[in-house]
Amino acid sequence: MEKAKLTKNLKLKIKNAQLTKAAGLDKLKQKLAQAGSSDTKNSPASKAQTKEKSSKKTAGTPAPAPEVDLGATESTARRIRAKDRSSFAAEPTVTTALPGDASHLTLDAIPAIKAPEITSVTQKEQTLRECTDTSSVQQEEKKESSEETSPETPERIEETPIIRTRTEPKSVVSIKPKFGPTGKHINHLLAKTFKAPAKETKAASTEETTQQQPRQNDAASHNNKQQPSGTSSRPASSAPSYRRESTSNNNNNAKRGSERDRSKRSDESVKAFTGRDRYGLNEGSSEEDKWRKKRVHKTKKQAEEHVVQCPAHIKIALPITVKDLAAEMKLKASELIQKLFIHGMTYVVNDVLDSQTVVEYIGLEFGCTIEIDSSAKEKLCLVENTVRDEVNATDPEKLIIRSPIVAFMGHVDHGKTTIIDALRQSNMAASEAGAITQHTGAFKCTTPVGEITVLDTPGHEAFSAMRARGAEVCDIVVLVVAGDEGIKEQTIEAIEHAKGANITIVVAINKCDKPNFNVETVYRQLAELDLLPEAWGGSIATINTSAKTGEGLQDLLEMLALQAEVLELKADPSARARGLVIESELHKGLGAVATVLVQNGTLHLGEALVFNDCYGKVKTMHDEHNQLLQSATPSTPVLITGLSAIPKAGDPFIVVKNEKVAKEIISARLAGQQRSAALQKKRPNFDAVLQNKKTLKLIIKADVQGSIEALAHSILNIRSEKVDVEILSSGVGDISESDIRLASASKATVIGFHTSVESHAEPLIKNLNVKVCLFDIIYHAVDAIKEIMTGLLDPIAEEKNLGAAEIKATFKSSQLGTIYGCLVTEGTVVRNQKIRIIRDKEVLWKGSLSSLKRLKEDVKEVKKGMECGILLDNYQQAQVGDILQCYEVIYHPQTL
């Protein structure tokens, strides 16, 4: 039992020593020991005398042996022996043979011994020592109490040194390595616990063998100083045991000292890699540097940031964002923004800089020369000259005569497509929805006077963009005017397009077979538009035609051939192909297809094309009869496949070296378009929010690109101060599942023009409650959109007075409340209508009439001059003399 108690005491001392060293209290203890040794009051001699006096008083018998021994050690009282003994070693116990009455005196003197008070220690240091030695003092108190209750015999004391001297440095090594709460390895602290100067250790070991008694007294005094005030001292039996230490114990202590020296030297010579090394806490010379973590990587980063400098010369393309420009200049975006703000220009990191002057000024401020890269512009515009300029600059020997491109233009239902059918001997007009042309047709037809390339343009007002493209592409414009109706709005628009493009105009006055045909009216209208006909002495050729009877068609062809001969239309078939997109669509089996018209050069199968925002490689090429072609000569319209996307109608195209070059060009163009789009980013319409305007959101799908343009143009032209129209997206093809989901999320209406709904998207329309409208005729679509816009407007409420009654008396009812006896003074009071109470020309209440009675019978209405009983709905504050007005609320729909 005593062995386990001693082992536990040893572990507690080891732990206390570790904590003392970690808290830096070992130095404090050394200072306290020095202060105590220098103090005369706390000298070993005085303490021994005090102990002797107290023992004499208690026992009543003299004790000469302790008195003589303590006097002999008076000269060595100031020697400190703290370094020669490890705090982890067991306390030495000496086996001696005491005199006859010595043991009796010692056992009786135990309760009378008290620890001397240390006067040289401040209260703060004393409290700190109490905290660190609490566990050891408690163990000593338990030990003293056990010794007081059961005094041991001298034979028992002789057995204790064998048990208490088994402590070796191995007990320190057996402690499991672990990290403390600060992340430092505990081995570092253990290695420092045994540190002591080598010279002092050697001197202490020599003095242990020669001068045992002074060392024992010093150690006893040192142990007494370590005890805090207020605690009991060691038993008196320990004093004589120190004086009678055997030589065997001296040998054991010397061995333990040499082992500790070897362990210290091994720790100092070979230092293990600990957690402090991992976290960089062992670097530095001073004690504070060892506890401070060195963050080398952060200091390196800061040094690198200061090293980075702005380059002297950079090359960029405009437009460019502030963030991208700062990255090119190796600067922070905040520095550029600050510099711009100082000079009165407010920008954020995502704003776009498109001014060359501003960009060059920024570079000048930071000492950087900025060069604008124009190679992107060269890719954006492959050729600067037009097709006509290119033909005029070509060697005349390479030029050949090409067939004329003729565009038939005019008002809707004036017979353009019918005349073309008569020339081609086909029936295209019957296949058009609503018997009106809504697409641009391009095809070649063989006539007795040669081949003619015909463009059939829509006549509806919504297709002005198509008519404009037709006027730009063609060589001759055939202006079709109905002789019975004369010139209309779209006819005037077609004339303006032709004049703007400086194109020859031939007027075909159609429907000459009708009885109300009046050619003079048409001549007069043409003259008013500065188109003086040849019959009136002008230069404009006019021909009377009839598509039904075929009258005048041959004369029309001859006139076209004559005009083409006068124009001397030529082209270079050996040049690379250039032309325009007439129409484009998304085919289910072929993908993106486009009808293109070759204006110059020859287009071959397998060549790479570049459009405005897409590219392609010609995989197949068909004519209007769906025959496969290997090449297309000038003035030939063909249908091509193999495109990366759907090109827009009217986009020019040109042949490039290969598909790789075409892809690079389009990538550069798309990057430029994104930067331009950032400049023209749509701002929210705060005016519409303040005015509380309704917004109709639309998703448009059509069969061809031209139809989308026409429909969007017509929708945006609907003027309304109450409703705005916003087109969320538009595309070519059938209405897909993604379109339905987008419409559901944004609460939009889907408009389909000449298209249908995909099969797997139809169930979503009902599940998500999305409104989908399909149209084949454009003006039907426009009318339907106007109705939808009108439906968004809240109806206007109008109050119509029906009659009035005056309250003559009031009657209280426990079940119904207040019943008003009234006389109808005006009109008719009708049940289930609205009532307002008026007093002194002010409306007090508005509500409904819940009950109307006449002579205890429920009636629907009471006319003027009759009395009735009226019960109001949840109102009982009316008085005699108030006027009850009966009125009806009528809602009227608003108009755009």
Swiss-Prot record:
Chain segments carrying region Disordered: 32-99, 117-304
Comp. bias intervals (Polar residues): 35-48, 215-227
Location in the cell: Cytoplasm
Protein name: Translation initiation factor IF-2
Entry's Gene Ontology molecular function annotations: GTP binding; GTPase activity; translation initiation factor activity
SUPFAM superfamilies tied to this protein: Initiation factor IF2/eIF5b, domain 3, P-loop containing nucleoside triphosphate hydrolases, Translation proteins
Comp. bias regions, Low complexity: 203-214, 228-241
Stretches the record annotates as G1: 410-417
Species of provenance: Chlamydia trachomatis serovar L2 (strain ATCC VR-902B / DSM 19102 / 434/Bu)
PROSITE patterns associated with the record: G_TR_2 (PS51722), IF2 (PS01176)
CC annotations in GO: cytosol
